[in-house]
A protein has these predicted regions:
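Alpha-helical support elements that line or immediately flank enzyme active sites
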Residues: 1, 83-111, 128-148, 215-281, ...
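Gly/Pro-rich active-site capping loops and adjacent beta-alpha segments
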Residues: 1-67, 122-123, 142, 146-157, ...
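N-proximal accessory regions
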Residues: 47-106, 124, 132-141, 162-163
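General beta-strand structural signal in soluble alpha/beta enzymes
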Residues: 5-7, 68, 114-116, 196-200, ...
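Conserved beta-alpha junction segments in alpha/beta enzyme cores
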Residues: 63-64, 70, 75, 185-244, ...
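Flexible hinge/switch segments at interdomain interfaces of large molecular machines
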Residues: 73-82, 208-213, 365-378
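Short coil/turn connectors at secondary-structure junctions
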Residues: 2, 48, 80-83, 109-112, ...
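Fold-independent oxyanion-binding glycine-rich loops
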Residues: 69, 89-90, 133, 192, ...
Length: 388
C-alpha cells in the first residue's frame, strides 16, 4: 500500500524494507504514467515535510586538478608519436593548395615533412600539416614552409561585409523563418499611436580557450584511437568516420579534461587532420595548434544583426514587438538534425541563434523571425559560444 511507504533521503521505505532511488531506476524502464486527474488526486507533502534530494559531496576532479595531476588532452602522450602543427588556408572553404616549398625548413633539426589533408567531410580544406620530432621543431618549421593557395571565394570578405549583409536581411520583411507568431504584429504596428525601432549588432567572438585545440591519434588493430578533450562525442565521430571512410564503431574517442571548452570543443574538427596524418604516417600523431592558428581555425560565434520594432497603444502600453535577427547558424553546418521547425511549417531555423527572443513577457502581438546570413555561413564555420 503506497500510503504506508515513506520517501526520504533518496530511499523509499516501509514494512521493514527499503529501496534506494538508484535501485529503482537501475531495474529498468519506468513506464508508469499518470493522467492529469490522477496527478491532481495524489497527496502532496506539506512544505514542512519537504526536503532536498541528495547530499553534499566533494567533486571528484578537484584533488587531481589541485595537485596538477589531472590529464588534459594537451598532456596525452603515446610511444613513438610525432608532432604536427597546421598551416591553415586563407579561407575556411574553397582554398586549394597549389604548391608547398619546404626547402627552408629542411635544415631545422627535427623537421620531417609537410603533409596535405584530403578531407571528404569538407570541414578541413586547404590545410597543410608540418610534421616534426618535437613540437618546438614543428612550430619553427611551419614558419619556414611556404604554402601557396588558390584562395576560396570569400578571401576578401570582411566583418563589415557580413554585418552589412545582415542589416540588409533584417530590413527585408519577406526574409526569415517564423520562430514566434502570436497575434497580428503587422496590424498592431499599423494601428499604433507610437512606434520605436532599433538595430543592434554583435561582432565575431572567439573562444580563446586556455588550452588550444589539440588531438593525438593512433591507428591500432584496424581502429582509429583519438585522444582529446571533447564536449560532444557523438557529433564528431560520424564526421571522422566519413572523412576516413571507416565504420563509426571503429572510431574510439578517449575523452580528457578540458582546458576550457565554452562550446568550442562541441565540435572536434581538429581531430580530422590529426587522424589523416596518423594514417598516412602509420604512427601516432599529436596535433597542437598555437594560439594564432587556434584563432584562425576557430568555429567563431557569428556576427549578428538584430532589429526590434515596438508598437504602443493610445494608453502608452506596449501593443506589439516585431523582432528579427540574422547570423551564421552553427547547427545548420554541424548538426542539421537539431534545426527547429518554423511555427508556420515554412522552413527551419537554428534555435541556438534566436533562443531568448521567445521571452516570458506578455505582449498581445509578438512576431520573431530568424534569418540565416549565408555570407557568414559561407565565410567561416559558425560555432556555439557558451559561458556562465
Amino acid at each position: 500500500d503506497a500510503s504506508e511507504l515513506n520517501a526520504a533521503n533518496g530511499v523509499v521505505s516501509g514494512a521493514g524494507q527499503s529501496l534506494s532511488f538508484a535501485e529503482i531506476v537501475s531495474r529498468g524502464d519506468i513506464s508508469r504514467s499518470f493522467s492529469e486527474d490522477e496527478l491532481a488526486a495524489l497527496p502532496i507533502k506539506p512544505p514542512s515535510a519537504r526536503t532536498l534530494i541528495g547530499k553534499p559531496t566533494n567533486a571528484l576532479d578537484v584533488p587531481a586538478k589541485s595537485r596538477g595531476d589531472a590529464v588534459y588532452g594537451l598532456d596525452a602522450e603515446l610511444p613513438g608519436m610525432v608532432y604536427a602543427h597546421p598551416i591553415v588556408a586563407p579561407t575556411r572553404y574553397g582554398s586549394v593548395i597549389k604548391s608547398i616549398d619546404d626547402s627552408a625548413a629542411k635544415p631545422i633539426a627535427g623537421y620531417q615533412q609537410t603533409l596535405t589533408i584530403d578531407d571528404s567531410s569538407g570541414f578541413v580544406q586547404g590545410m597543410a600539416l608540418v610534421i616534426a620530432d618535437s613540437f618546438p621543431a614543428a612550430m619553427k618549421a611551419s614558419e619556414a614552409v611556404n604554402v601557396e593557395w588558390d584562395a576560396g571565394d570569400t578571401a576578401s570578405v570582411s566583418e563589415e561585409d557580413i554585418l552589412t549583409e545582415g542589416k540588409s536581411l533584417v530590413d527585408d520583411p519577406e526574409t526569415g523563418v517564423l520562430f514566434v507568431n502570436a497575434g497580428d504584429a503587422a496590424a498592431a504596428m499599423s494601428a499604433a499611436s507610437d512606434t520605436l525601432s532599433s538595430t543592434y549588432r554583435t561582432s565575431t567572438a572567439l573562444h580563446f580557450t586556455l588550452e588550444p585545440q589539440n588531438a593525438l591519434v593512433e591507428f591500432r588493430d584496424g581502429q582509429c584511437h583519438v585522444h582529446a578533450g571533447n564536449q560532444w562525442q557523438s557529433l564528431i565521430i560520424p564526421v571522422l568516420a566519413q572523412s576516413l571512410d571507416m565504420e563509426e564503431k571503429d572510431i574510439i574517442l578517449h575523452t580528457y579534461y578540458l582546458g576550457g571548452g565554452f562550446g568550442r570543443r562541441l565540435f572536434g574538427d581538429q581531430m580530422i587532420p590529426a587522424a589523416h596524418a596518423a594514417r598516412a604516417l602509420d604512427k601516432p600523431v599529436k596535433l597542437i595548434m598555437t594560439r594564432p592558428v587556434d584563432s584562425l581555425f576557430d568555429c567563431v560565434r557569428s556576427p549578428s544583426v538584430a532589429r526590434l520594432d515596438a508598437a504602443f497603444g493610445e494608453d502608452g502600453g506596449l501593443s506589439a514587438i516585431d523582432h528579427v535577427a540574422a547570423a551564421g547558424w552553427p547547427t545548420l553546418s554541424m548538426a542539421p538534425g537539431f534545426l527547429g521547425e518554423g511555427v508556420d511549417g515554412e522552413g527551419k531555423f537554428d534555435g541556438f541563434s534566436i533562443n531568448g527572443a521567445d521571452h516570458w513577457y506578455s505582449v498581445p502581438n509578438h512576431r520573431v523571425r530568424a534569418i540565416n546570413n549565408k555570407l557568414a555561413q559561407d565565410t567561416f564555420l559558425p560555432g556555439w559560444l557558451r559561458a556562465v
